[in-house]
Amino acid sequence: MSSIKGPAAAPAKFDGSALRIAIVHSRWNKTVIDALVSGTIATLKAQGVKESNIVVESVPGSFELPLACSKVISGSHVQAGASATDLLGGLTFGTSTPTTSFTSPRPVSRSSTPAPGGSGPVLANMPSQPFDAVIAIGVLIKGATMHFEYISESVSHALMRVQLDTGVPVIFGVLTALTDEQALERAGIGSGSDKGHNHGEDWGLAAVEMASNSRRWAEGKFQA
């Protein structure tokens, strides 16, 4: 008998080409993490998200995910609002006009530094938009103490709070497995004949769907 578990297909096909997505993952249980992150990235690309618009950051463990997601979201707004001059720290290229340092009364001049191509500063792939969604990926495997329960509950509540406080979808990609094999199967790398299913694929689909819907809802557009 086939399982009834799993999400139904989305009601529409979503185009991720205009989206910018962040992945924040822990480094505990690296074998499983690597498979999940790979599955997530592959799905995002299949949904049209450009590789240059996928940013991957890591933290030590799952407990650090909520803070990291919050900081990544706020930092992307800083990036999007920054000008080329902001990101270059106010340096001037190819000009004799000095700039004054905030930490020293002496003028700072970079007039001797040639600009790339000789025509002015060039910034490759300067971000122009904040993140439309963040995918938090972690792997918690129950051990002999209550550590598993405390971390699972704390991280779950904190990630929910991040998305409610910021208005940016945070996809819950934290596996809470009772055994090593459960974790491996949920990353599609089980040791048995049935390798399981890589949940990173589901998280990639959810990120594109929620990011697209959030944009639409923010504009007051709803399905008829």
Whereabouts are the PLM-identified features?
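N-terminal presequence-like segments and the immediate start of the first folded domain
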Residues: 1-20, 106-107, 111-117, 191-195, ...
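Glycine-rich phosphate/diphosphate-binding loop of Rossmann-like nucleotide-binding domains
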Residues: 11-64
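Short, ordered loop/turn segments at secondary-structure junctions
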Residues: 27-28, 59, 139-140, 174-179
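Charged, often glycine-rich, active-site loop that binds/positions anionic groups
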Residues: 66-80
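Intrinsically disordered, low-complexity domain-flanking/linker segments in eukaryotic proteins
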Residues: 76-129
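Structural motif
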Residues: 132-133
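C-terminal binding/interaction regions
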Residues: 137, 146-224
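Short glycine-rich, flexible loops that bind phosphorylated cofactors or substrates
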Residues: 142-144
